[in-house]
Amino acid sequence: MYRTAASRAKALKGILNHNFRASRYASSSAVATSSSSSSWLSGGYSSSLPSMNIPLAGVSLPPPLSDHVEPSKLKTTTLPNGLTIATEMSPNPAASIGLYVDCGSIYETPQFRGATHLLERMAFKSTLNRSHFRLVREIEAIGGNTSASASREQMGYTIDALKTYVPEMVEVLIDSVRNPAFLDWEVNEELRKVKVEIGEFATNPMGFLLEAVHSAGYSGALANPLYAPESAITGLTGEVLENFVFENYTASRMVLAASGVDHEELLKVVEPLLSDLPNVPRPAEPKSQYVGGDFRQHTGGEATHFALAFEVPGWNNEKEAIIATVLQMLMGGGGSFSAGGPGKGMHSWLYLRLLNQHQQFQSCTAFTSVFNNTGLFGIYGCTSPEFASQGIELVASEMNAVADGKVNQKHLDRAKAATKSAILMNLESRMIAAEDIGRQILTYGERKPVDQFLKTVDQLTLKDIADFTSKVITKPLTMATFGDVLNVPSYDSVSKRFR
């Protein structure tokens, strides 16, 4: 057997050598012929090869692409159980599919406290049909990427891969969301990571204060922490997560959104997997009331971190929510050192009037946190402790200046352009496009055209900005401070600085 194989190998080697010599001979003669003249180096034509400027005979050129490409239209289907499937085609070779749920920390009752945070970490773990190892291998086999995100009002699970693997993407995604196993050892492992994450939270003062303004500024559901409190960790188990999912992951509160997928093709795959979800009426959103308040945590150190925030309308008041977004861009801000490159954000209001004028500011930036029916607009700052009182007063004076109409048209035009470019550049990402589809349908019941958003931004005037800011700063103040807070003025004295 081995000799036969060897003789065949020798014969094959002889054929290959013969062909290789013929190839070398042909190549050599071609090179010799073409190199007989160097006119092609100076732009002339080769004597033996056709010019690339002359179309090949018998080859028809394809028609040129159109200068204008019609944007893809959103297609939606609502299953009998109330679940919505929405798709938007794109020319990209890859697709992004997400399952978005109207469920977040606002739906946590005391027995479920911290469940949203842990659910985010338990995404794409073992299911009733797959081990975590098998799940990872299947995702790797199609070159996919998965992610999960949790917020106060919504949960999102996404998968991204080439379009040819849409059935596999859908099956893995739905199995992970519908059939999580919540194995004890996996839950305990993620709880250990949650504890580490909570411990590291104190090293992120801005993130810590953004959580604090919610707990201090609201009473009710929006005051629930997005991050699991340490006191709740011992009560989180696989059974708790299972009950939370059973109560909240119902068909009428889910949207499956996709970017880069044919709608009919997706529908054929999704419908058998999701049509049996229970048709439970969508519950009323838990109530929250903005009240304002004061939060202080003294940890010492060489800096004072503070956040001043006010209530703004939510996304259901679309125009005013857009004004809040433009106002955030107008105020801008950043750090005393621009890590994003020279000039980044240096024409914004806070940069020009605070960071450039007062070196005691290490950072100062505007932020928004907008929900369906309410939201927050505020300014975060970090200064040296001895400058804390003056720094807070300066921030208040800048808010008053905007309310008094001190913003000029140049500032507003720059903020409007920055807002539009940020939205349009984000929507170039298929993952963000799919997320935008899912979250808008959960909020509005439809996806509003981006042109409508851009038109609203274009129509904003200086008076709109001034009137909006004037109304906002009359609401109760929410103030949160962290670090060396000994020199931070009282809540009442800061409140009085806003007219």
Curated annotation (Swiss-Prot):
A cellular-component GO term for this protein: mitochondrial inner membrane
Compartments, record wording: Plastid, Chloroplast stroma; Mitochondrion matrix; Mitochondrion inner membrane
Swiss-Prot/TrEMBL GO biological process terms: proteolysis
Bilayer disposition of the protein: Peripheral membrane protein
Chloroplast in keyword set: yes
PROSITE patterns per the UniProt record, alphabetical: INSULINASE (PS00143)
Family statement: Belongs to the peptidase M16 family.
Functional description taken from the UniProt entry: Substrate recognition and binding subunit of the essential mitochondrial processing protease (MPP), which cleaves the mitochondrial sequence off newly imported precursors proteins.
Complex and partners: Heterodimer of alpha and beta subunits, forming the mitochondrial processing protease (MPP) in which subunit alpha is involved in substrate recognition and binding and subunit beta is the catalytic subunit. Component of the ubiquinol-cytochrome c oxidoreductase (cytochrome b-c1 complex, complex III, CIII), a multisubunit enzyme composed of 10 subunits.
UniProt protein name: Probable mitochondrial-processing peptidase subunit alpha-2, chloroplastic/mitochondrial
Organism of origin: Arabidopsis thaliana (Mouse-ear cress)
Gene from which the chain derives: MPPalpha2
